[in-house]
Amino acid sequence: MASKGPSYRIENIVATVNLGVELDLEKLAERLTMAEYNPDQFPGLILRLTKPRISALIFRTGKMVCTGAKNEEDLKNAVRALVKLLKDHGADVPFDPEVQIQNIVASGNLFAEVDLEQAVLMLENAMYEPEQFPGLIYRMSSPRVVILIFGSGKIVCTGAKSEKDVATAVQKLYNQLKDLGVLYIEEGEAEEGEEEL
């Protein structure tokens, strides 16, 4: 069996949504039975959707923060569902609000052990202090992401703004480490739910 390239799985997408209108959170909290609203503890109204499984923090200013999406399509569907829910319960919000992805977190596997001691010497913008943290912290400039690299070949990618950025960063990292000679490739298969590159 030939060695395979890296794989990854998106764990969370955080996005902001600008509805462009002020919202009466007290009124929405009364009408939406599933809403959580306790302004003494937190200024936003919390809504949790089950399909897709996403949480939304909704603020009086008309700004929303959505977390929990596993892909961009789920995020779009969740925003549509939230807009419909708000409209159905008296909020005058636009059908197509501005949505901006702030951060995508993905976990992955390079299917190779990584010599972190050598990698930190050869990669620019890399930091490795095993007494403090077992992973190498690599700040990639393009795409602009931070990748935690562990000796086992497991990785965590943060800071991506699109699914394409994640795929590009993981493949680019794999190629860089392979070219530097710090990967010890093993045989293996992608775990369920991971995208193979």
UniProtKB/Swiss-Prot annotation:
Gene: tbp
Sequence repeats: 10-86, 101-177
Keyword Phosphoprotein: no
UniProt-listed GO biological process terms: DNA-templated transcription initiation
Gene3D superfamilies: TATA-Binding Protein
InterPro entries cross-referenced by the UniProt entry: TBP, TBP_archaea, TBP_CS, TBP_dom_sf
Keyword Transcription regulation: yes
A family per Pfam: TBP
Protein name listed in UniProt: TATA-box-binding protein
Organism, scientific name: Pyrobaculum neutrophilum (strain DSM 2338 / JCM 9278 / NBRC 100436 / V24Sta)
Keywords, in A-Z order: DNA-binding, Repeat, Transcription, Transcription regulation
